[in-house]
Each structure stands twice: as structure tokens, then as C-alpha cells.
Regions:
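Conserved CoA-thioester-binding segment of acyl-CoA-metabolizing enzymes
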Residues: 1-68, 104
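Terminal peptide-recognition signature
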Residues: 28, 32, 47, 65, ...
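Glycine- (often His-adjacent) and acidic-residue-rich active-site loop
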Residues: 48, 59, 67-102, 121, ...
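Crotonase-fold acyl-CoA enzyme core
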Residues: 104-216
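Charged catalytic carboxylate motif
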Residues: 42-46, 98, 105, 203, ...
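Helix-loop "lid/cap" segments that line or gate small-molecule binding pockets
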Residues: 173-174, 225, 229-230, 244-250
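Acidic-histidine catalytic/liganding microenvironments
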Residues: 57, 109, 265
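Amphipathic alpha-helical segments at domain termini/boundaries
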Residues: 12-31, 179-211, 220-230, 258, ...
Length: 270
């Protein structure tokens, strides 16, 4: 797409890098290492634009979110927060709405997402991780929801963090502001895997290879059904929806090819 090519140029050497590898894997890289990848309104706006472009792009198997520098993200830039504290309530509502838009677009992105964490992930950085489908962290990573330390709370990221770690863990982490390591992050389901930093690339390749083998439309449908029915009562409407989804996939070109390829003991053509 033209917009994709323009974004690659426009965002190169900016605070967010946007690249496509092997024509199937997209990489979004936080690139503000001098500020420990803390994000402000400029980064949030860039992420919204990038996520919108990805949503409307074709033939993507995996979207990876990572960072340059020592740390994944220090969360919201406090200079930005200080500037916003001098703005009106209406201006702060508009600003917060932009952040919630970005988080929602990341969480609801139709393609699978992989967060790769090195170093510190604080505040909003934890929110970004919580919005991704898979989280892979280096063993030396540290995490914190430290907003209460500066008289704030993790409000906009709260739905996604609570969804990831559960209400009881969130109550502790939101109110204490304590730091915790990658082992605790895995125990509470904030991250799925821990690896030595030198082994991260091997694990990334593992996930890329797996997603490349899967039916692309099936992957999109699999993610969507989780978002569609999570926390809903298992009533007739949910049951009917699941029947409709599997019926459509069984009779789709991709579904027929996948089953046929399996029975013929060959790789599917997709």
C-alpha cells in the first residue's frame, strides 16, 4: 500500500519505527531511548496511524511490538503529564481519549500481536503489553504500575491490565506501585514466556514460524471469537454465533484447502 510505504519513510528515525519483514511480519518499534521509550501525544498519534494502516493491510501473519534501547517503555512521559496538568479538564479528556483509542486499536487489531520486552516496562508500558496477544520477556525485565507514586492511577490501561492479570492482582499492583520481576509477571499472566536476552531472537523466530504455518483467515477468526465471546453468558446467542463461525470456515476456500492438505499429507497453499 502507498500509505504503508510513506509511513516507513516518515517514521524512520522518529519516535516509532514501522517496518515489514518477509512481507508477512510487521514490526512496530518504540524508538525514544533517550527518554526510556516513554510515550507522549506524538508517539500515541503515530501508533494510532500505524495500527490503522496495519488493520487495513493484507497478508500479515504477525505484528511484533518491541523497543530500541535498554528499556521497553517507562510509560507516559512525565513532561507530557506536567504539561497536561496545566490544561483544562476538556483538553485532558480529549488527550486521554487519544490514548484510549490507541490502546483499543492495539487490543482489537485483527492480526495476532507479539510484545517483546527488555528492561523496564512501567505504567503505560504494562498497558501496551496487556493489549498484545502474546508477551515474551527477557529474564532481567522489571515491571511496575507506578502511577500512584506521582499521585495518578493507571486508569486508561486498567481494562486491559485487569483482563491480563485478574482483578485481585490488579488491586495489589495498582495500589502498591511496587516493582516486580519477570518471574512474577509470568505467574500473574502478564507475560507468557521468559527467555535469556540472547535467546529472545530464537523465541521470536519460533512464533513467526508457527504463525506462518496457520491459515491466515482462521487466525483472524480465532482471535475475533475470543474478543467476541469473552465474559459473555453462554446463552443461545453465543452458541448460535459459534455455530455460524465454524460453518462459515468449514465451507471457506481456506478451510477446504486446509482439511484437504492435511488428508493428502502436504502443506496447504496459503
Amino acid at each position: 500500500m502507498v500509505l504503508t510505504r510513506l509511513l516507513r519513510v516518515a517514521r524512520f528515525m522518529s519516535k516509532v519505527l514501522y517496518t515489514r519483514h518477509d512481507n508477512e511480519v510487521v514490526k512496530i518499534t518504540l524508538n525514544n531511548p533517550s527518554r526510556n521509550n516513554a510515550f507522549d501525544d506524538e508517539i500515541i498519534s503515530s501508533l494510532i496511524t500505524i495500527l490503522e494502516d496495519i488493520e487495513h493491510s493484507d497478508n500479515i501473519k504477525l505484528v511484533m511490538l518491541n523497543s530500541n534501547g535498554k528499556h521497553f517503555s517507562a510509560g507516559a512521559d512525565l513532561n507530557w503529564m506536567k504539561r497536561m496538568s496545566n490544561c483544562s479538564h476538556e483538553e485532558n479528556l480529549k488527550d486521554a481519549s487519544m490514548l484510549t483509542t490507541m490502546l483499543q486499536k492495539l487490543n482489537n487489531l485483527k492480526y495476532p500481536t507479539l510484545a517483546v520486552i527488555k528492561g523496564a516496562a512501567f505504567g503505560g508500558g504494562v498497558g501496551l503489553i496487556s493489549c498484545c496477544d502474546i508477551a515474551l520477556a527477557s529474564e532481567n525485565s522489571i515491571f511496575s504500575l507506578s502511577e500512584v507514586k506521582v499521585g495518578l492511577i493507571p486508569a486508561t490501561i486498567s481494562p486491559y491490565v485487569i483482563n491480563a492479570v485478574g482483578a485481585r492482582n490488579a488491586r495489589r499492583l495498582f495500589t502498591s506501585g511496587e516493582r516486580f520481576d519477570s518471574n512474577i509477571a509470568k505467574q500473574i499472566n502478564l507475560v507468557h514466556e521468559i527467555a535469556k536476552e540472547e535467546d529472545l531472537e530464537k523465541r521470536i523466530s519460533y512464533f513467526i514460524n508457527h504463525f506462518k504455518q496457520n491459515g491466515p483467515q482462521a487466525v483472524i477468526a480465532a482471535k475475533k471469537i475470543v474478543l467476541d465471546i469473552f465474559n459473555k453468558e453462554i446463552d443461545n446467542s453465543v452458541i448460535s454465533h459459534t455455530c455460524e463461525v465454524i460453518s462459515a470456515l468449514r465451507t471457506s476456500k481456506e478451510g477446504r484447502e486446509g482439511v484437504t492438505a492435511f488428508l493428502e499429507k502436504r502443506n496447504p497453499n496459503w
